[in-house]
Amino acid sequence: KGKDVNAMKATVISFLLMFGLLIAGCSDNENEEELPAPDVPDYSTIIVKGIQNMPKNFTFDRVEVKVTGLDWQVIETLIFPYENGQIVMTLPATFPSERLQKVDRRNGDMAGYWTGTSNDGDALVATLGDFFVFNGDTRVGRIALSNWSGKGSSAEKATLVSYQYADRPFILTGSDKSYYYSECSFNKGWNIFANINPSEGSSQKVLRTTTVPESTLFWRLAESYVYNK
């Protein structure tokens, strides 16, 4: 009888151990499933304020920016007022697919946007052009987002930033005579991308990337078309 009791105890202990391992395994799987998806940055609204390099007598009342798409054509002109020292640009949430541009120039197709190669050749894009500022009917200048003050050389890793809409995620790789692509992945919707210049005197190409040092960026008056007489 003593042997039977001991055998029964061993069986119960083994069962409990196996049950515990199963519970732990389920718990681990649940924890893995509960991990949140990485946050996708939202660039659908651009807020411009604290514009640098503006002369005291420089005034404007709005910004206009063209969106290019299919065959490099302008598919929309966006207009936003300059009010209370800032511009709030709410970008279109979507575009008709037939108005969008091919993502890259594979097979020598110059109608495509990027010189790098997309991992999804069916992706389509639309791109913001220059941010021109107006005072009434007169175009008085251009503003830009970068970490370059506009003084001296734009080399030494100056970052020049633009915005692009994508109809699906894609990743760019490759290089051409002037640019190379690294850490250049786009999400569905609006994205920020940068051209980062090499150091002065360097033989490196300009880096194109979506890994942008945003904390270093600021808006500035890049060009003024108003001349004091």
Feature locations, PLM:
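Long, low-complexity intrinsically disordered regions in eukaryotic proteins
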Residues: 94-168
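Short, exposed beta-strand/loop patches in secreted or surface proteins that constitute
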Residues: 77-81, 132, 183-184
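Sec-dependent bacterial lipoprotein signal peptides
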Residues: 1-24
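Short beta-strand and strand-turn-strand segments in soluble, beta-rich domains
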Residues: 69-76, 175-178
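Extracytoplasmic cysteine-anchoring/structural motifs
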Residues: 154-229
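Glycine-centered loop-to-beta-strand initiation motif
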Residues: 44-50, 63, 76-96
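Short, ordered, surface-exposed loop/turn motifs in non-cytosolic proteins
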Residues: 54-71
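Bacterial Sec-dependent N-terminal signal peptides
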Residues: 20-47
